[in-house]
Regions:
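A short, well-structured alpha-helix characteristic of acyl/acetyltransferase catalytic modules
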Residues: 1-35, 43, 161-171
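Short alpha-helical
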Residues: 12, 37, 77, 125-126
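Active-site acidic-Proline motif in GNAT/NAT acetyltransferases
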Residues: 88-90, 94, 122-123
Length: 171
């Protein structure tokens, strides 16, 4: 069984971001921006994540191997947006993203966060199924008319974190 945990992001993780942000197959499922990203741009974006102290950013670890990134960002009206990327493709389809999301939800609940949402590309069916397994519900399609790379997303919400943090669950 593969064990999953989250750890705080650190400077050495920039190499993972550089790799994942340049992977066209991965980008088609996430941002949709397929243009090449320079080392300077990677560094700029990564430093913004690394230095951000108000949001939660973690690396997803599976059996001591870094396989992805997950975040929780405060938005309006006590809502928090989550995003996850399992960047290492050999770990796709194994339920590890779902495990990471459940761990993040537990951390959120411990910190009093009860309203979480995400936006996902409608074509990313594997991700949508994972989010539904974690308790997210489809709410609406969101049009992004000014974003040529991501014209539409599907908003999914988890209004009340219902996972019992005291219950031992096999993760």
């Amino acid at each position: 069984m593969i064990k999953v945990h989250l750890r705080k992001i650190k400077l050495a993780d920039i190499n993972y971001f550089a790799k994942w942000w340049r992977d066209k197959e991965l980008l088609k499922l996430t941002s949709g921006i397929l243009k090449f990203i320079s080392d300077q741009e990677v560094d700029k974006y990564f430093q913004a994540i690394l230095n951000n102290k108000k949001d939660y950013n973690f690396m997803v670890i599976a059996n001591r191997k870094t396989i992805g990134h997950i975040s929780l960002v405060k938005r309006q009206n006590n809502w928090h947006e989550t995003q996850i990327v399992i960047g290492e493709k050999k770990y796709w389809g194994k339920g590890l993203g779902s495990k990471a999301i459940k761990i993040l939800i537990k951390k959120a609940k411990k910190n009093g966060i009860t309203k979480i949402y995400l936006e996902v590309r409608p074509i990313n069916l594997r991700a949508i199924m994972a989010y539904e397994q974690c308790g997210f519900k489809k709410v609406k399609r969101v049009k992004h008319r000014k974003n040529k790379y991501l014209p539409e997303t599907l908003r999914m919400e988890l209004k009340t974190c219902t996972i019992d943090i005291n219950k031992k669950t096999p993760l």
